[in-house]
């Protein structure tokens, strides 16, 4: 399935386009419901009811959000459902009701990585009927909404003072907040941290053929060839998610070859494609991408990432590159996923291990789910929801089945052994070794769609498509840079806080703004800086009004 969006989120949409998008989203959702929901427990589709709980709904219409919504009800738009966050939602919804006194209505719009949900949310915002709260990634993704919204940044609640008040600036892993701060301004609230750039390995297959565990890239290549020689399909890289899985594989290979700084330059579109070293790295990445995809499981074209993991769990393939949301899905189908430690790799009863993509074990690819809150009639309820969900108490409930927490003093409350390993890696990774995963919020939404489409096509056609793919990559990165420059004019020109950029990297328009037609004022300051520097100043009455509940903060 090939998805391509010819318009840019950053450019805004006409009312006609909005209507078309809403109609398309509704049709997509109806198709998903008829098919038995987007998520399945394996390659064979099993129909499930569309209502997971009384408050968790796969919607077939776009519900309006108006002042008639009950005062204790909050509407949350998401792409989670079934195995991808469904279990965690079933736990957080009653907790929100018990501790925050809110009835949480969750509308799920299926699509890997938010492919469909992002456009439905945007359409509602542009139509002046935003949801009370919505799921959004950290990284530049949130700026896509800012640049397209009718009132720009003023469409959304500035969350910086709230996160200060709630203690996250002091108690969360700092890199997590840097990944969502735009020159010091935080526009959404983190609720979990996923790890991208991981590889799922069926260790029983490796034992059957006496093959070593792929701790490094050369071993991964060796295992791939040996498994193929034994008639086993080494890889499953599904195509049913529109190119998102291909993007995962390509970026993981690039991270191994190029390291974190050059990877983070892709976030800003500043990678120098004229540099011979960069050209060599891109060529090598393309080579290994085509190499691994040539060993793909038959029928990959129509499969989703969930169906792909079912093949891993069943021992039909050895490798799947993705993020650790797959580990949460494993809980849904009753599969235990273990970390890459010797006692598990050598254990004959262990079948699935999650490991950092070979060669990237010292890096941490962040994928951070957050809550965005539009200014509107349900703003206070949405703030109450975000307050509880982001609290230590809320994190114990939510991240048991979803990703890991960002609190620096968390304990092992997780459902899967691999989650605790990922959490320990998170709190012990050096600042310069973080990246923000490109395929899950690390690029603007229109760039994301272009790269997805380009890589899916490259896998389909092979080497003859390299020239077209390279052209797509270069033009996409130019678009990425242009959209960051537009953000810079709004004072949102980089990830991080003044003096503390994400991963220690400033894009060049921050260090040399005049070369990009910018002024120093648009780069070095933002309206939230004083709030960041002076957290003990009196805060707005709105904060006090939602701070009347105490949530456990250890």
Swiss-Prot record:
Residues in the Cytoplasmic compartment per record: 1-17, 547-554
Extracellular side: 39-525
Transmembrane segments: 18-38, 526-546
Record flagged with keyword Transport: yes
Localisation per UniProt entry: Cell membrane
Region forming the signal peptide: none
pH dependence: Optimum pH is 1.5.
Recorded topology in the membrane: Multi-pass membrane protein
Cellular component GO terms held in the UniProt record: plasma membrane
Keyword Transcription attached: no
SUPFAM superfamilies cross-referenced by the UniProt entry: Periplasmic binding protein-like II
InterPro entries (alphabetical): Bact_solute-bd_prot1 (IPR050490), GlcS_GBP (IPR054925)
UniProt keyword list: Cell membrane, Membrane, Sugar transport, Transmembrane, Transmembrane helix, Transport
Similarity-based family: Belongs to the bacterial solute-binding protein 1 family.
Role, per record: Part of the ABC transporter complex GlcSTUV involved in glucose uptake. Binds glucose. Can also bind galactose and mannose.
Full protein name: Glucose-binding protein GlcS
Originating organism: Saccharolobus solfataricus (strain ATCC 35092 / DSM 1617 / JCM 11322 / P2) (Sulfolobus solfataricus)
Lineage: Archaea, Thermoproteota, Thermoprotei, Sulfolobales, Sulfolobaceae
């Amino acid at each position: 399935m090939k998805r391509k969006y010819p318009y840019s989120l950053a450019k805004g949409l006409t009312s006609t386009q909005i209507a078309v998008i809403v109609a398309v989203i509704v049709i997509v959702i109806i198709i998903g419901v008829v098919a038995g929901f987007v998520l399945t427990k394996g390659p064979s589709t099993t129909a499930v009811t569309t209502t997971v709980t009384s408050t968790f709904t796969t919607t077939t219409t776009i519900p309006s959000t108006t002042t008639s919504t009950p005062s204790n009800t909050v509407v949350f738009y998401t792409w989670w459902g079934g195995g991808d966050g469904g279990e965690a939602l079933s736990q957080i919804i009653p907790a929100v009701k018990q501790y925050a006194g809110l009835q949480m209505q969750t509308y799920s719009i299926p699509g890997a990585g938010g492919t469909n949900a992002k456009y439905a949310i945007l359409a509602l915002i542009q139509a002046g009927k935003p949801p009370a709260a919505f799921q959004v990634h950290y990284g530049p993704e949130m700026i896509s909404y800012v640049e397209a919204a009718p009132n720009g940044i003023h469409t959304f609640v500035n969350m910086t003072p709230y996160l200060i008040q709630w203690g996250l600036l002091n108690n969360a892993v700092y890199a997590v907040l840097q990944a969502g701060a735009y020159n010091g301004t935080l526009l959404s609230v983190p609720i979990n941290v996923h790890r991208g750039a991981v590889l799922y390995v069926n260790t029983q297959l490796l034992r059957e053929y006496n093959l070593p565990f792929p701790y490094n890239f050369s071993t991964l290549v060796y295992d791939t060839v040996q498994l193929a020689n034994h008639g086993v399909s080494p890889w499953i890289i599904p195509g049913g998610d529109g190119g998102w899985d291909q993007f995962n594989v390509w970026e993981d290979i690039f991270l191994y070859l190029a390291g974190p700084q050059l990877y983070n330059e892709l976030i800003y579109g500043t990678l120098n494609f004229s540099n011979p070293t960069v050209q060599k790295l891109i060529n090598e990445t393309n080579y290994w991408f085509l190499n691994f995809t040539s060993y793909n499981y038959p029928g990959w074209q129509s499969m989703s990432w969930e169906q792909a993991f079912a093949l891993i769990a069943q021992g039909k393939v050895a490798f799947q590159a993705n993020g650790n949301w797959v580990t949460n899905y494993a809980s849904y189908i009753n599969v235990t996923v273990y970390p890459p430690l010797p006692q598990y790799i050598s254990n004959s009863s262990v079948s699935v291990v999650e490991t950092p993509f070979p060669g990237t074990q010292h890096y941490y690819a962040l994928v951070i789910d957050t809550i965005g809150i539009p200014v509107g009639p349900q703003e206070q309820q949405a703030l109450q929801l975000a307050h509880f969900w982001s609290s230590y108490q809320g994190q114990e409930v939510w991240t048991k089945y979803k990703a890991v927490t960002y609190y620096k003093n968390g304990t092992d409350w997780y459902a899967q052994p691999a989650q605790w390993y990922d959490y320990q890696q998170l709190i012990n990774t050096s600042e310069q070794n973080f990246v923000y995963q490109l395929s899950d919020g690390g690029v603007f939404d229109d760039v994301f769609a272009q790269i997805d489409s380009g890589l899916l096509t490259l896998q389909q056609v092979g080497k003859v498509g390299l020239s077209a793919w390279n052209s797509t990559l270069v033009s996409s990165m130019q678009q990425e840079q242009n959209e960051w420059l537009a953000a810079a004019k709004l004072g949102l020109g980089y990830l991080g806080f003044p003096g503390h950029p994400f991963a220690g990297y400033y894009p060049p328009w921050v260090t040399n703004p005049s070369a990009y037609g910018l002024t120093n004022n648009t780069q070095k300051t933002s309206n939230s800086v004083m709030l960041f520097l002076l957290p003990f100043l009196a805060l707005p009455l709105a904060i006090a009004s939602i701070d009347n509940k105490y949530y456990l903060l250890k």
